[in-house]
Amino acid sequence: SIFNLCLISAVMTMGANIQWGYAGLINFGIMGYTALGGLAAVLISVDPVQEAWRAGGFDILMGLWLVIVMVLVIRFILKRFEKSKIRTYSIAAIIISGILLIRFSMEPGIEAIEAVDPAKTGFLGGFGLPIIFSWIVGALFAGGLAFIIGKVALGLRADYLAIATLLISEIVIAIIKHEDWLTRGVKNVIGLKRPAPYEVNLQQTDWFINLVEKFNLSKLNLITDLTERQAALNQFVIEGSSIFVKLCYSGLFLIVVIILLILTQKALYSPWGRMMRAIRDNEEAANAMGKNVVKQHLLIFVLGSAIVGIAGAMLVTQDGLFTPGSYRPMRYTFLIWVMVIVCLLYTSDAADE
């Protein structure tokens, strides 16, 4: 279990290291992207709650439609009109009125959904798909949020960018905690689907029992009493099933880590990677050579955040539950940054030698 957590933390560290090591971007919003990955695991793997959809699904869809309309209107204004105070005030008015209208249209549906068996459900559920698909969706969620943040905040100075990303991650956690219709909030979501077999099922499978018996044959041969021998075998099967499941997760997580390591190393020594290092070392010189610094910063910001989103989905996959109250900056942001700094110090020392 500790080894699996180390693998997941390694994936998070790779995401932060891409942003800092490749482009010099400080992102203290790792906790928010991790939570979005966990949210993806819930939305993908949990079966839809049909009664909740009948109670308030239409109101939720109407609210989402209003969000799309608001975004399209703002995009139209940004493209059609030149920058001015009137444009700024118009966009602000659209956002404020849009939020109020969206909340007003969704409120009855939200109350109806949260009233549907709140002890067990009280939310819309998900798509009922295998949870491993959530790793891809988690990357899309985190990358999408990073794109929005990057469009607004990447022009800030490094210290302001760090503060902005930290505050936005806290906003994400607050939304996940309080929107019960989407995530059950602090009531948690348990019993998520697993990509690995269940221990109880393994303990009743003949091939697994035979495998455990072969591994522990020398110990079992020391027991002469048949009843005691069977009891010892049952205990070995119980212990072995837990180890087998953890090894299954370790195999899946190792595959992800190896793939990401290969891709990041190839990217680092590619022409694109050399360009990113040039931008990191001297933005003004890279800009003078015709490189689009803003675009490349946005790209690396999205890629690093997407990798963190994958790690967030992996974490919830292993735990089998989603607990929004457990997301804290000390564990999911600053500890990861300590790992990034230690890795950079180690690699710089190795380069000096």
Please identify what each model-predicted range represents.
Residues S1-D349:
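Transmembrane alpha-helices and adjacent helix-loop boundaries
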